[in-house]
UniProtKB/Swiss-Prot annotation:
GO terms for biological process: trans-translation. GO terms for cellular component: cytosol. Residues 135-151 have a biased composition (Basic and acidic residues). Residues 133-157 are annotated as: Disordered. This is SsrA-binding protein. The gene is smpB. The keyword Cell division does not apply. The keyword Cytoplasm applies. GO terms for molecular function: RNA binding. Keywords: Cytoplasm, RNA-binding. It comes from Bradyrhizobium sp. (strain ORS 278).
Amino acid sequence: MANKNEPKITVAAENRKARFNYAIEDTIEAGIALTGTEVKSVRGGKSTIAESYADSRDGEIWLINANIPEYLQANRFNHEPKRPRKLLLHRKQINKLMGAVEREGMTLIPLKLYFNERGRAKLLLAVAKGKKLHDKRESEKKRDWGREKGRLLRARG
């Protein structure tokens, strides 16, 4: 049963392949600057962040290649689906993320796009390092073994 004190968030888009393709070091919550039609489209649940990433430009962090489709009920004031979107972070957070990307060869990957309890659009951003093919195989073996172990324990018990 859900706890009443738990924050109520509505997940709009999730990057499910990110945990398989990347080794996640750290996560950070960032606000995202959206236009009105983008917010309505995201609430509709059609947006995807699977192929997107974050990059630094002119001392700011931008979300690149996130697909938020056009809002059908909007007319000529609609938005461009794959435009770069500014992420709202504190200066210390931006400097930390830019340092990790430049010095350590990390990548900024969005994990989840959601609305918090106040109705604000937020993006869970991960500082991650790309996995090699053998690392992916190893994590797949661990996952399969966990499933098999669960099956064996259920059959036995």
